[in-house]
Amino acid sequence: MPEYPVNSLTTVWREMTTVNSGENIAEMAQNQPVMLVFLRHFGCSFCREAIFDIGNIRPTIEQDGFRIVMVHMAPDAATAVKFFKRYKLYPIDHIADPEKRFYRAFGLGRGATAQLFGLMSWIRGFESTILEGHGMSAPSEEIGDGFQMPGVFVLHKGQIKNAFIHQMSHDRPDYLEIVRCCEL
């Protein structure tokens, strides 16, 4: 993916502060590459699968010099921490965005019926929920918007270096491939 400036986003980046450390994304990404992961709602098995996948490869990503920041829609840190701990991804930098302002700033919208409820979503949902054991629960205000689509962005020195925009709710990105764009 070609590098492109994100002047319109830099203001938003400064406003995106982590719940746990109070740092903002603009400063973080100036110092080291950041893998910014926008999650679906915590009740979604695909969201839980993403947290699990990232937890498994976190040491490799961080050893390569990247910082991982999760963006979620839960209004309180306790809800997010519960899920991050469950998947051994705590402590982790995370940003609460219950109004989905940052999701919109990065071009992540709400999914259409076909993106969320197509046959492959049901098949992958069974795989993730039952076979992999991630479970699920109904969307609620405390865990996020059930129609929100996720995405992954690699940010560094004021630019988006790479991105993975989910076309379907069940897409399972290769996070290691996504960060390879910026190997230090």
Specify the residue positions occupied by each region the protein language model found.
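Structural microenvironment flanking redox-active thiols in thiol-disulfide oxidoreductases
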Residues: A50-R104
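A short, polar/charged loop-to-alpha-helix boundary motif
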Residues: H170-L184
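Short active-site neighborhood of thiol/selenol oxidoreductases, capturing the structured segment around
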Residues: N24-G55, R67-I68
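Thiol/selenol-based redox catalytic cores and closely related redox-interacting motifs
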Residues: Y90, D97-H170
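N-terminal "domain-start" segment that seeds a small globular fold
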Residues: M1-A29, E49
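Short, thiol/selenol-centered motifs that function as redox-active sites or metal-ligating centers
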Residues: H41-I54, M73, A77, V152, ...
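A generic local structural motif
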Residues: N20-N24, I54-I57, V81-K82, P139-S140
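Generic recognition of short, well-ordered alpha-helical segments
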Residues: R48-E49, K82, P173-L176
